[in-house]
């Protein structure tokens, strides 16, 4: 590329810059990346997800609170999924308020960032503790302490604390900018900040939990096939469904985020075409991730005995009517 600048000594007299000539940059121009979905379509999707989230999770949470005396350890972790998805509903509501420029400031931006990142970090850790609990129930089936509901309560609290720790860095660097932007920024170091946050997010909420979950489920499957448990087929089905749902809905987003990190640190050469493809990929896979967290309690509540029994009773009542 050849850049032609027509300067003369008069342009720099008294340390001033008075250039008015033409600059030819050839085919060089800033990358313009448009959003894949329009603002109106995005608002409609957010409203739809908010309604599905609020109605579905309210049903599951109501069932848990009404029949809490019959709850088991897994049911407490199912309730954690409900609370997590309700935090996501709070984020969707605040995102809609920001799109219409209603009641936004830095404090509300930080609250929005907390709701979003808490919901993203909390679900993987709940899945980790579900796999740990499943492993304990298989390996320590004869121990009474494993079957106590206190285990589920402790695991739920631990997962919440770990999720808050993951969300905190995002909240600290989020600021509000007119007219309606909540941005993670650190002045001239914003690019390095986002690279670090992406790396932390990938390892803390994806690679680490996935590694622990795979180990626990592998040990559980090995133990199941070595013994003759009466519910072996049911447990294997639950483990398979849990893994498949995570692979289909979550892994694509983390793959795109990892590619974006590699692009930012220079491992992959950046071009406008690559940048556009990554942005579009992140937008699509992010929608899948949000949909997964919205529907997660309904899908996983079917594995919990409390909700499954109540649903069966309601269906029988409806059929008799």
From Swiss-Prot:
Give an example GO molecular function.
Answer: C-C chemokine receptor activity
Cytoplasmic topological domain residue ranges: 52-76, 142-149, 216-234, 304-321
Lipid bilayer topology: Multi-pass membrane protein
Q: Does the keyword Ribonucleoprotein apply?
A: no
Q: Where are the transmembrane segments?
A: 35-51, 77-93, 125-141, 150-166, 197-215, 235-251, 287-303
Residue numbers on the Extracellular membrane side? 1-34, 94-124, 167-196, 252-286
* Primary localization: host cell
What are the recorded Gene Ontology BP terms?
Answer: calcium-mediated signaling; cell chemotaxis; immune response; positive regulation of cytosolic calcium ion concentration
**Glycosylation positions?**
14, 18, 117
UniProtKB keywords: G-protein coupled receptor, Glycoprotein, Host cell membrane, Host membrane, Membrane, Receptor, Transducer, Transmembrane, Transmembrane helix
> What is one GO cellular-component annotation here?
membrane
Intracellular or extracellular location(s): Host cell membrane
Question: What role does this protein play?
Answer: May be highly relevant to the process of cellular transformation and rapid T-cell proliferation effected by HVS during latent infections of T-cells in susceptible hosts.
Q: Which family does it belong to?
A: Belongs to the G-protein coupled receptor 1 family.
What is the name listed in the Swiss-Prot or TrEMBL entry for this protein? G-protein coupled receptor homolog ECRF3
């Amino acid at each position: 590329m050849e850049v032609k600048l027509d300067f003369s000594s008069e342009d720099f007299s008294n340390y001033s810059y008075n250039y008015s000539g033409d600059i030819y940059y050839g085919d060089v121009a800033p990358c313009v990346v448009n959003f894949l979905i329009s603002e109106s379509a995005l608002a409609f999707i957010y409203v739809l997800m908010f309604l599905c989230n609020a109605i579905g999770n309210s049903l599951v949470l109501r069932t848990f609170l009404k029949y809490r005396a019959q709850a088991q350890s897994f049911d407490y972790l199912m309730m954690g999924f409900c609370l997590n998805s309700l935090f996501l509903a709070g984020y969707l509501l605040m995102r809609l308020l920001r799109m219409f420029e209603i009641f936004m400031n830095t404090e509300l931006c930080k609250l929005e960032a907390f709701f979003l990142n808490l919901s993203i970090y909390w679900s993987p850790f709940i899945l980790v503790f579900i796999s740990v609990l499943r492993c304990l129930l298989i390996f320590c089936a004869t121990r009474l302490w494993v079957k106590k509901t206190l285990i589920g309560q402790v695991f739920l609290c631990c997962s919440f604390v770990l999720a808050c720790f993951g969300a905190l860095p995002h909240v600290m660097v989020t600021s509000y900018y007119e007219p309606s932007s909540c941005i993670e920024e650190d002045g001239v170091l914003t690019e390095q900040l986002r690279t670090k946050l992406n790396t932390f997010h990938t390892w803390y909420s994806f690679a680490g939990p996935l590694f622990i979950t795979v180990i626990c489920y592998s040990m559980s499957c090995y133990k199941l096939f070595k013994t003759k448990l009466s519910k072996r087929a049911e447990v294997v089905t639950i483990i398979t469904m849990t893994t498949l749902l995570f692979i289909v809905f979550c892994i694509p987003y983390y793959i795109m985020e990892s590619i974006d990190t590699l692009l930012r640190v220079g491992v992959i050469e950046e071009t406008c075409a690559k940048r556009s493809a990554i942005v579009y990929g992140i937008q699509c896979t992010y929608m899948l991730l949000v949909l997964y967290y919205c529907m997660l309690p309904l899908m996983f509540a079917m594995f919990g005995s409390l909700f499954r029994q109540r649903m069966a009773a309601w269906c029988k009542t409806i059929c008799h009517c």
